[in-house]
Regions:
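Short, solvent-exposed turn/loop segments enriched in Gly/Ser/Thr/Pro and often Arg
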Residues: 6, 133, 178
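GST-like domain detector, emphasizing the conserved glutathione-binding G-site
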Residues: 1-104, 108-111, 118
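Active-site-flanking alpha-helical
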Residues: 53, 141-142, 175
């Protein structure tokens, strides 16, 4: 089941949610069928993806070399793409005052990260070879490229990647969820 957390209404600060996600951030899950048959709460998108990948055996290779490749792109998203694009979006759209330095800095870093990804995708469909939890983590940020002042046509491999991932039936089902 999906329980929407409305961050504009400060739902993330409710005590029940803080028991699941002490960092008061989304996403967070509760797996009623966790390890040893006990419920487990998992917060942070990367941790959730790794947990579900290990549990299901899907989209998270067991071969150590392939797993490291997936993990480094997952960490790239968590430590670079997500935070920088989030700051780009914040300073470009939501900041109470326009701060040119912040806008320029995060726009430049966003473009640099798109270029890194565009280069990585030369000759391959997914960031780590096969579809993985890294791709699952990256896509939501790319879907907001227009809000990040990104001309997606400047990054043809990223544009094709977005189209390829968005065409996956499971991705279409996820994007159709209204919360």
């Amino acid at each position: 089941r999906i329980f929407p957390i409305n961050i504009l209404e400060n739902d993330q600060f409710q005590s029940d949610f803080l028991k699941i996600s002490p960092n008061n951030k989304i996403p967070a899950i509760v797996d009623q069928d966790g390890p040893r048959g006990e419920a487990i709460s998992v917060f942070e998108s990367g941790a959730i993806l790794q947990y579900l990948g290990r549990k299901t055996g899907l989209f998270y290779p067991t071969d150590e070399q392939k797993r490291v490749e997936v993990e480094q792109w997952l960490m790239w998203q968590m430590g670079g793409l997500g935070p920088m694009l989030g700051q780009n979006h914040h300073f470009g759209k939501f900041a109470k005052e326009q701060i040119p330095y912040a806008i320029e800095r995060f726009t430049a870093e966003t473009k640099r990260l798109y270029k890194v990804l565009d280069q990585q995708l030369i000759g391959q469909d997914y960031v780590a070879g096969e579809y993985s939890i890294a791709d699952i983590a990256i896509l939501p940020w790319l879907l907001r490229h227009e809000l990040q002042n990104i001309a997606i046509d400047d990054y043809p491999n990223v544009k094709n990647y977005i189209e390829r991932l968005s065409a996956r039936p499971a991705v279409q089902r996820a994007l159709a969820i209204q919360v």
